[in-house]
Structure formats: structure tokens, C-alpha cells
Amino acid sequence: MQRLLFRSLFYISSLLLFYCFYKVEIAQTIKRQDYLFYYILFSLIIFFYFLFISIKKYSEYFFIIIISILGSFSLYEIYYVYSNKNKYFENSYHETEKKKYESKMNFYNKNKEQDDSSIIAYNPLIYYQNNQKLLPISHATNSNMILCNEGGYYSKWSSDRYGFNNDDAVWNSKKKKIILLGDSFVEGNCVNRPDNINSGLQKLNEKYNFVNYGISGSSLVHQFALLKEFWPKNVSKIFLFYYEGNDLVEIKDEMKNPIFSKYFKDNNFSQELMENIKKSDEVYRQVFKLHMENLENNFEFQRNYEISNNYSKVFISILKLTNSRNMINFLLSKKKISDFNDYEINLYEETLIKVKKFVEEKNSQLIFVYLPEYSRYNTFKYYKDKFYNYNQYNYKKIFDMINKNNIKIIDIHQLLFLKKKDPLECFPRKKPGHYNEKCYFDISTILNNSLN
């Protein structure tokens, strides 16, 4: 019986190992790291099978080892499913998600009744069509923008004449300007305007006019386009914010967009958005209707699909040892330097050099601000059904890149988070997401001190 079972495991493992090899090395449709767990597991089974038939004296022990390994992984899968049973098998999870969705829609509808310009902020890049002649790269202008809820309330702010999170009077001021360039952390997602980084700087320093160019979901190519399109007069400095959580991922996606690609490749390319801001506004509002339809349709589809397919999904997940694979890959990744982001890092540096040259030609100074992500400080680094880990290797490479290009660095990880007893206090309810109001102001203080 042992021999028959072991032989069956051997044949199955051999076939699956060949399948993994084909998918990773020949078809190249899967990253090697994603299937590393299966490589190891199937190789172990094959290895112990040969020991089983070669050293009969200890064959029973080899059999027990393999069964113990497979049994341990299976028990872990069952434990994981049990610990998340509310999400998988009960309606309470879906009802919670439904309440979140309905809460946001109710907030939007109430604001819409009071202010017809109300609109839920989104990144227009995600709805870009190949035949689209104009791509908005900021939000709707002079509008009541509604964002997210991480701290117990939905944040909102009034956009300026170009679709940024500023008081419109900023464009009339004759003071020297400092531009804040970045993604949702700069834009001020999930907090109201008085509590974002830009507002904090304005409270602390009346010498400069601080202008917020933050756009959610943007990386450096998008941000370079913002500078080229909306460069104002009398700019002294640029605070360029790098968020380690997703900037390298998003810059690769931006280069796939033909219009952003033109910004990168052609120094003279422009959509003349300052002059065409009304047209940009029209496109943004038209696409917003599609965005609202997708919000509703995706929620209903996802909810119905998950409820009807949970049992089959869980069974397949256990069979594939999905969570065991994620755990092993995560543990191995901490001990291994990975270079899979080298393309993104090189692309980021190429764009950074272009940004630096552009800024210096305008007689301004570029200052690089490093923003850390939640998983850097999360002890377990496991949330949203996946393992996450900040990449210390990328951290070093980014800093080497910035130093090589002679750009001043402000490291918020070192200057703020490492000085806190519990860095997770910077995140609302200590959950993954954006920073809270207090830490946004702490960052404003650090940036202001760098100016003095």
C-alpha cells in the first residue's frame, strides 16, 4: 500500500514538475518565484521516492516524512480557511462590503444634492481608450471631490482651476512657489484639506506658496507630465515624493499608455492642458459616468460571484496549497535579494533624470522625499489574503540612484517612523492604507525644517 501510494505521488509530482517547468521556463507565463514552492515540493517528493526504493531499510521513514510534509501543509490550508470562515462562507463579510459601498454612494448623493459639482475622484488613466485624443491628467476643475474613508469619515476637498487639491487663490499669489509632486499620499487621500501635507506646510511657513500637484495612482511619468503641462511662474523648489508601496509598479503601467509614453520620449510633447482645461474637464466628467457604472456593476458582480463560487474556490485553494505557497515564497523572499524590479528601477531613474533636468532648466531645485509603506512596520506582514514585504534591496537601490544623481534626500522612514515606539500609529486604526492627520502634519514639519 505504501509503495503504491508513494509511486502515485511520484508520477503525479513528476507530471506537475514538468508542467511547472513548461509554464515558467518555456512558455514564460509565470514568474519563477511564484512557482518556487511547487519546484521544491515536487522535487522533494521525487527525491524521497528514489530514497524509498533505494534504501529499503528506511523506506518507511521516508514515506512518513513525505506524508508529514503534505499533511502539515494541508492542515495549514484548513486552518487558514477556518480562521477566515466569516469571509468565505458567511454573508456578514459581503454585507459589510455592501454597507461600505452604500455608505459611499449615500455620501456622494447627499453632496450632489447640495453641490452639483460633486464627483468621486478617480484616475482617468484606468479608462483610457487607444483612440482617445486627449487624456486628462488631473481631476475635474472647481469641483467638490469625494475620496475615501479610512479614519471614520469620507474625505472631500474643492479642486482648483486645474483640478488639484489646492485653494484656487494659490495661483494668484506672487510668493515663491514650492510644488509638492506625488501620488495619493501627497494629494491627501482619506483626510480633509486642512490635514494634508500641503496644508500643514502652508500653516508652518508663510514665506512660500505651497502648491499640491498630488494625483492618486500616479507615478513619475504621470508626475513629469504634470510638471510639463502645469508649470507656474516663480517656482523655487519641487518636493518629489516617492512612495515605496507602488511607485515602481505604476511607472511600468504608465509607460504602456501611448500619451504618457510621448511625454517620456518627446521633450516637446504637450497636450496644452492649461489652454485646453475645459476640454480636459469635459472628458473627465464624461468618463466619470463610466466610472460610476463600473463601481456599481463590479460590486454586484464580485459579490454574487464570490458567494456562488466560494466552496469551489476554497476547495481548489486547498488542493493547490495556495496559502502555504504564499507563506513559503514570502519567507524565502526575505532571505533572497530579488532583481525582478530592475526594469522599473531603471525606468524610474531615466524619468528622474528627465525631471531633474527639466526642473533645473527652470532654475528650481528638486528635493526627493521617501515615503515608507505599511508593510515595512507590520510585524506579521500578512493582510488582504496575501503576504507583503517591503523590499530592502529596492530601498538601497533607490537611495543609490538619488545620491548618484546629486539630489537632496529627505527620508521620512528614518526621520519620523523609526523614531516612533509603534510606527503603525501613523496609520488609521493601525490598518494598511494612508497616513493619519497627525503623521501628515509631522511630515509637513520635517519638510519645513529642511527649508530653514
Q: Residue locations for each model-derived region?
A:
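Histidine-centered active-site loop/cap adjacent to the catalytic His
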Residues: 1-6, 428-452
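Membrane-interfacial loop-to-transmembrane alpha-helix junctions, especially the N-terminal start
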Residues: 2-12, 58-63
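Membrane-embedded alpha-helical segments of integral membrane proteins
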Residues: 8-51
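Serine-dependent acyl-ester chemistry module
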Residues: 11-27, 243-399, 407, 412-418
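Internal/C-terminal transmembrane anchor helices
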Residues: 57-80
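Hydrophobic alpha-helical transmembrane segments in integral membrane proteins
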Residues: 74-94
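Membrane/wall-proximal cationic-aromatic binding patches
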Residues: 87-204, 416-430
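Conserved SGNH/GDSL esterase-like catalytic core that processes O-acyl groups on lipids
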Residues: 156, 177-179, 187-270
